[in-house]
From Swiss-Prot:
This is NADH-quinone oxidoreductase subunit C. Belongs to the complex I 30 kDa subunit family. Signal peptide: none annotated. Its EC number is 7.1.1.-. Its main location: membrane. It is found in: Cell inner membrane. It is a peripheral membrane protein. The gene is nuoC. GO terms for cellular component: plasma membrane. Keywords: Cell inner membrane, Cell membrane, Membrane, NAD, Quinone, Translocase, Transport, Ubiquinone. It comes from the Bacteria. It comes from Methylorubrum populi (strain ATCC BAA-705 / NCIMB 13946 / BJ001). NDH-1 shuttles electrons from NADH, via FMN and iron-sulfur (Fe-S) centers, to quinones in the respiratory chain. The immediate electron acceptor for the enzyme in this species is believed to be ubiquinone. Couples the redox reaction to proton translocation (for every two electrons transferred, four hydrogen ions are translocated across the cytoplasmic membrane), and thus conserves the redox energy in a proton gradient. It is an enzyme of class 7 (translocase). It holds the Pfam family Complex1_30kDa.
Length: 219
């Protein structure tokens, strides 16, 4: 009975997942049909719908997703960035929305580069304000129409954008408190390392070398 019950639960979960994918597929077709060329591609993965939207149409797309009763994605979750240095438009701006009415999530992506701003989503979702500031701070992605596009997490005068793939792991400057000057000071990062003489003939490496003093008398 337990095995049958377990198989029954697994079967029901499989059917539910298939029904969920069918609902997401219907939602994707509905959205792409309504938005037309504003949506360049869409896909379903891990139970979530992903839309690729033209940057210039992001406000239009977000407004439709929020206001259309067949979508009702009114819960704004967050905005984040992703860096793909090998691409000409290296950045993805990713918007995550939730529809409580339809129990669905949608991921909206916009591709851009460091010089091309993305229209701000604040007119549609005011909560996007600080998320756009965070994305600008960490990736250097610009948002046109933002009322106060300043850094949010890094320090004043911070150089670079720390979540870019080409940003050095050590950063450019070291921030520390100088007790002699009684203030915070900024200094170039110095990774000095004193000379170390490695013993490459160590027996722990499993080599066949014989170190001085380890010779055995021949029998």
């Amino acid at each position: 009975m337990e095995a049958i019950t377990t198989n029954g639960i697994t079967l029901r979960r499989t059917v539910a997942a298939a029904q969920g994918d069918d609902a997401l597929r219907a939602m994707g077709e509905r959205i792409t049909g309504a938005l037309g060329p504003a949506v360049t591609d869409w896909s379903i993965a891990h139970g979530e719908l992903t839309l690729i939207v033209q940057g210039s149409d992001i406000v239009y797309a977000l407004t439709y997703l929020r206001d259309d009763p067949n979508c009702a994605f009114r819960c704004f979750i967050d905005i984040c960035g992703v860096d793909y240095p090998q691409r000409a438009r290296r950045f993805d701006v990713v918007y995550h929305l939730l529809s409580l009415r339809h129990n669905m999530r949608v991921r909206v992506k916009v591709q851009t580069d460091a010089a091309t701003p993305v229209p701000s989503a604040i007119p549609v979702f005011p909560a996007a304000n600080w998320f756009e500031r965070e994305t600008y701070d960490l990736y250097g992605i610009l948002f046109s129409g933002h009322p106060d596009l300043r850094r949010l997490l890094t320090d004043y005068g911070f150089e670079g954008h720390p979540l870019r793939k080409d940003f050095p792991l050590t950063g450019f400057v070291e921030v520390r408190y100088d007790q002699d000057e009684a203030r915070v000071v900024y200094e170039p990062v110095k990774l000095t390392q004193e000379f170390r003489n490695f013993d490459f003939l160590s027996p722990w490496e499993g080599t066949d070398y014989v170190l001085p003093g380890d010779e055995k008398k021949s029998s």
